[in-house]
Regions:
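Secretory/periplasmic and organellar redox-cofactor proteins
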Residues: 2-32, 37-251
Length: 251
């Protein structure tokens, strides 16, 4: 990664994170990651969930609708698991910031990775629900009642896959995550913006008005520009604020 590209990405992502060096991993050449280890786990974990779903659908179940139905039929359990990992995420952050205990970048990365990977499953559920409502995919998503054992096998395999990624990324290819991280961050915000525009499209899809049907695309473009403006603005404003607060209050 070229120095100019790195500096540009480090700047635009500075609005997302404090970027404190001791709370961040380092990549090849000693380059600090664009966000802290906890946020690194969050963004990569979100992307990882969609990769795991794709790989399992392609090579194990060989039917994308099988996993889609498992997710749709067991969303309450998935939300419970997400809240469990979110509590670990929050407890680790709160107790370390309040100096009740010391934590490590490995723990920060772990809590972010597992929390966000299950957040990805919830996002997948919302995408499936919207697509089903928009395109009436009742044949593909039939909400068939799968046995709990099928879902348990899937969720265990999913968590095992996340764990394997966690261990291998730490001990084998951690420095190379620096290259994956920008993709994961952009993917995260792309999914959020797309979900918002899909919801808008769902609201106007029944209206026979060509101009209104263009509204979701206009909103998508506007949100992208708004996000970039937000990132650049925070990048300029943040330099002398977050670090000062950290040095005076937390350190």
């Amino acid at each position: 990664m070229g120095k100019k590209i790195y500096d540009f990405l480090f700047f635009i992502f500075s609005g997302l994170c404090h970027q404190i060096s001791e709370r961040s991993f380092c990549g090849i050449g000693g380059y600090q990651f664009f966000v802290c280890s906890r946020d690194t786990g969050t963004y990569i974990g979100f992307l990882l969930s969609f990769i795991i779903i794709f790989l399992l659908s392609k090579f194990l179940y060989k039917d994308k609708n099988y996993i889609n139905n498992l997710i749709s039929s067991n969303i309450k359990i998935i939300i419970f698991l997400f809240l469990f990992y979110l509590s670990l995420f929050g407890i680790d952050g709160i107790t370390s910031y309040s100096k009740l205990r010391e934590t490590t970048n490995y723990i920060r990365y772990f809590t972010g990775l597992f929390m966000a990977s299950h957040l990805g499953l919830i996002f997948k559920y919302f995408e499936l629900s919207i697509n089903k409502a928009l395109y009436e995919q009742s044949d593909n998503l039939n909400n068939k009642n799968f046995s709990k054992s099928n879902f348990i096998k899937f969720i265990l395999l999913f968590n095992f896959s996340v764990l394997i990624f966690y261990l291998t990324s730490l001990y084998i290819f951690l420095p190379y995550l620096l290259y994956l991280l920008p993709i994961a961050i952009f993917f995260y915000f792309y999914k959020i913006i797309k979900l918002i525009t899909d919801l808008i499209y769902f609201q106007v899809s029944d209206l026979n008005n060509n101009y209104l049907n263009l509204l979701p695309y206009i909103v998508f473009i506007a949100l992208v520009f708004l996000l970039m403006f937000f990132l650049f603005s925070l990048g300029y404003l943040k330099e002398s604020s977050i670090i000062e607060i950290y040095q005076r209050v937390i350190k």
